[in-house]
Amino acid sequence: MIVPAEAPRAKLDRIEALGAELVPVTHEEWWQAMVDRGRQGVEGFFVHPVADEPVMAGNGTIGLELAEDAPEFDTVVIPWGGGGLTTGIASALKALRPDVRVVTAEPETGAPLAAAFEAGEPGEIRFEPSWVDGAGGRALLPGMWEHARELVDEAVAVPLAEVEEAVRLLAARAHVVAEGAGALAVAAALRREDRCVCIVSGGNIDLPVYAGIVSPAAAA
């Protein structure tokens, strides 16, 4: 499995525990592998983590569950990493509940979708890696802008301080351990006044990073 070398150790350890052989590369090389749908010297069948249709269809079951089990909401807020999660959820949900607004959340250190909506077209932006490693980037992956224009109503860039506050809120009130990308949706929803469903998409965060965020000193 091709992975960014700077990914949280907690995430990499769990992948290895499932028997995978890791091929760590720089963030730039990892991104290029997704653009090229493979990497020279790495053999095997390439499953795209974002733009693979069965993966997106699997994500769509979340949208089906929301429509069936949580009917009283106005907006779904989804973290935007590469776009596969949003595309899947929004495709299913819009088919059943076209009135629901789809809002994506990205870290302001790298929010290519928010920038694309503002500019009216996708382009490369300045990207600063951060502890919110599961979202954010310098550009949209090929094909994702077309999906986003059709399915997304609003794209929000969230300051890291607000993401940290969302991590603390999830820990204190919901007893949920969320990584940065997972807490993005909650951080974006806290700005809103409508009824929101937040997709807290992951809890793979290294313990020292998490402890530094939820400690009383960090919250002061």
What are these regions (language model features)?
Residues 1-220:
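PLP-dependent amino-acid enzyme catalytic core
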